[in-house]
Amino acid sequence: MCLYRFPLLSNLITLFLLVPWYASAEPNKTRDKIVPQPIQEMFQSNLVYPQEKDEIQFTLFPSFSKNLSGQKARTLFEVEYGITDAFQVIFEWDGLLYQNPVTGPTIAGPGNIEVGAQYSWMALGDGNTHFSFGNLIELPVGPVANGLTEGFIEVQPFIVLARDFPELNQSQIFLEFGFDWVDQVRNVPESSAPGFDSISWNVGAFFPIGFWRATLEINGSNNKWDGGSRNDIYITPGTIYELSKEWEIGIAAPIGATKTSDDYRVVGYLMREFELD
């Protein structure tokens, strides 16, 4: 992928590379303020919360989806590790993929991997506003000959802005905005669809009720601006239960709201978090 074609992408990657230096050089203004984290993950959005230093989190997101072309399933596995209290590295693997197309044989196999990082500025202003910047790079290591994966390398910078409401049981609303630049780097069958750059956005909220967390997301992704035909929007209600300080479990049912969206999805969630020291 030629970065001179995408000056904004070049600037975002430069900022991403400077984040670790900034994290060590930034004056410590809000570190003494403890920001509650009633929830660790959402189902189809990134949250602003970072892992603390030497804290590691394992998350499993099994999912199933159905649309006019067939059925799909995957077992997304994610690892997050805190380098500092504000800077974390991320590893994701699509796990085992399964596709049952309406026309064609059923196919299955391992998916792609993603690596990246995220830096968070917590407790800004009055202490209830947070901001983070991150970037993920998807590497096309999955099989392409059978069409299970598409052979794209993808660069996915994103930002998240969140606002807490302590008077409402530490509930939160957030906005995420991101880009997805794609470039086909592996040979694929001639019938494969070309790749288009896309814009993604997520708006969501969660509300803690005892050990339960009610969640709601509106998730969008659009590549029409780059010549594609996809405009996906999902309404994603979900619920998460805090089994303990280290364990969470949940389920969500994203509902497609546009013609190009899946008819429906089911997303599971299992999280384990612990400190290494």
Outline where the language-model segments fall.
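Transmembrane beta-barrel domains of Gram-negative outer membranes and organellar outer membranes
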Residues: A25-D277
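Cleavable N-terminal export/targeting peptides
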Residues: M1-V35, L276-D277
